[in-house]
Amino acid sequence: MMTYFVFILSTVFVIGFVGFSSKPSPVYGGVGLIISGGVGCGIVMNFSGSFLGLMVFLIYLGGMMVVFGYTAAMAMELYPEVWISNKVVLGAFVSGLFMEMLLVLYVLKEGSVGSMFEFSSLGDWVVYDVEDSGFFSKEVVGISSLYSYGVWLVVVTGWSLFIAVVVIMEVTRGG
């Protein structure tokens, strides 16, 4: 039952991303991003990451609401464009939904999806010993794998955020 619940949440997550990537109007794009962020936090909470899910929900979505409020106020249109008002935007949205449905049917037919990475050195990570048995904390393992195996992701993300701040400063300055 929980597998289907996560599968439905993942589908809503991707549909929300398709909704805001087709960006008909900033208002609808922001709503799609907020829905996808909330559903992503629910997925994280389902996999026993309650602290991480709660922090992302409070910090990310709290910040998103502030940014969304300012951008929606600055880019407000008298007649905002919806997904069905432009044939190109509607075609992009429908083709994205079609690709998602093909992926859903493939996963349901095959029954599994492979993983790209295999983590063989789990002994290097933090193990909590309780009497004769030990266990890994999922949040500690996730953070340690992010900074060991995914250091390239941290570098690219940091650089992207830096460039985004520089671009925003140049746009608002008028240069």
UniProtKB/Swiss-Prot annotation:
Signal sequence bounds: none
GO terms assigned for molecular function: NADH dehydrogenase (ubiquinone) activity
Location of the protein in the cell: Mitochondrion inner membrane
InterPro entries, per the entry: ComplexI_Subunit6, NADH_UbQ/plastoQ_OxRdtase_su6
Reaction(s) the record says it catalyses: a ubiquinone + NADH + 5 H(+)(in) = a ubiquinol + NAD(+) + 4 H(+)(out)
Keywords associated with the record: Electron transport, Membrane, Mitochondrion, Mitochondrion inner membrane, NAD, Respiratory chain, Translocase, Transmembrane, Transmembrane helix, Transport
Keyword Nuclease: no
Group of enzyme by EC: translocase
Taxonomic superkingdom: Eukaryota
Keyword rRNA-binding attached: no
Gene Ontology cellular-component terms listed: mitochondrial inner membrane
General function of this protein: Core subunit of the mitochondrial membrane respiratory chain NADH dehydrogenase (Complex I) which catalyzes electron transfer from NADH through the respiratory chain, using ubiquinone as an electron acceptor. Essential for the catalytic activity and assembly of complex I.
Assembly and interaction partners: Core subunit of respiratory chain NADH dehydrogenase (Complex I) which is composed of 45 different subunits.
Family: Belongs to the complex I subunit 6 family.
Protein name: NADH-ubiquinone oxidoreductase chain 6
